[in-house]
Amino acid sequence: MQCNDVQATEPDIKVSLTRVGVTNLKKLVKLKRKNKRDIVLLPTFEVFVDLPSSQKGIHMSRSPEVIEEVVENILLEKEIYGVEDLSVEIVMKLFEKHEYATRAEVMLYSDYMMEEKSPVTKKDSQEIGKIIARAYGVKDSNGKIDVKKMVGAEVVGITACPCAQNMLKENAVVSLTEKGFSSEDIEKILDSVTIATHNQRGIGTVMIEVPNGYTVGISKIIKIIKDSMSGEVYELLKRSDEAFVVEAAHKNPKFVEDCAREMIKRVVDVFDYLPEDTQVLVRQVNKESIHRHDAFAERNSTIRELRDELKTLTN
């Protein structure tokens, strides 16, 4: 007995849908690297296609089927893959399986293990970051498909609030003055001690478009994010390490806006070889310690726009 293709029938309400698909789909992926051991990931996929108003539903099983096929093919081939290239292949396969689709999108998130050493005692530990890839394809009326891809990372760090620190410094000046210290002595004292403030766990994200013929190193993105906050966080810290991390962060206080702007500047400097119309997304979220809310800053732009703004500021 042949089953009817219910998905291909007309819906009761004839309205198109922008994105239909599956989320929270996990697969084991092994990526090849030149002259290095393979990277094994357990990414979470989100895959979508659009749906015309004339069709009741997408053929839902085809989307996870596409991921399975692409992942299996990677294991058999000798080519070197990046997560962004994996996403592009999935997008192209989605168009093959969903012939009615004019748009297809893939998002990939995965934990990424990094070897770290504590800053003073040099103890080895494993740190976890998150790598992200996105591919988005559009098919025109002639069947031509244009796909854009992005790659990025999300890293946790520490930030120290400049505002509270400045207020405590002013309070210290008043207190020391009342106790009879001279202005010269107060300046020496404040230069010799670390002024307290409240901290945040910062979460920095950078996504960069990868034009055809270009590469964008995830390790470079991770370094940019780490270097743009008040300091790094570590899984393993002995007492001397902990003192170093806290003091270093308090000597480098930053607002959430400072972190975002620092990432922007570093992206423009490090990836100066990318075309000027390359898309860049920078986001910083700081988990507040003395508030119930979080602080947020973001910029979505092109390399050209960011470079021009930075040039204007330096002239």
UniProtKB/Swiss-Prot annotation:
Site (May be catalytically important): 161
Cofactor: Fe(2+)
Keyword Cell inner membrane: no
Annotated catalysed reactions: GTP + H2O = 7,8-dihydroneopterin 2',3'-cyclic phosphate + formate + diphosphate + H(+)
Pathway(s) annotated for this protein in UniProt: Cofactor biosynthesis; 5,6,7,8-tetrahydromethanopterin biosynthesis
Enzyme Commission numbers on file: 3.5.4.39
GO MF entries: GTP cyclohydrolase I activity; GTP cyclohydrolase IV activity; iron ion binding
Cofactor note: Binds 1 Fe(2+) ion per subunit.
Database matches in Pfam families: GCHY-1 (PF02649)
Assembly mode: Homodimer.
Job of this protein: Converts GTP to 7,8-dihydro-D-neopterin 2',3'-cyclic phosphate, the first intermediate in the biosynthesis of coenzyme methanopterin.
Name of the molecule in the record: GTP cyclohydrolase MptA
The species this protein was found in: Methanococcus maripaludis (strain DSM 14266 / JCM 13030 / NBRC 101832 / S2 / LL)
Lineage: Archaea, Methanobacteriati, Methanobacteriota, Methanomada group, Methanococci
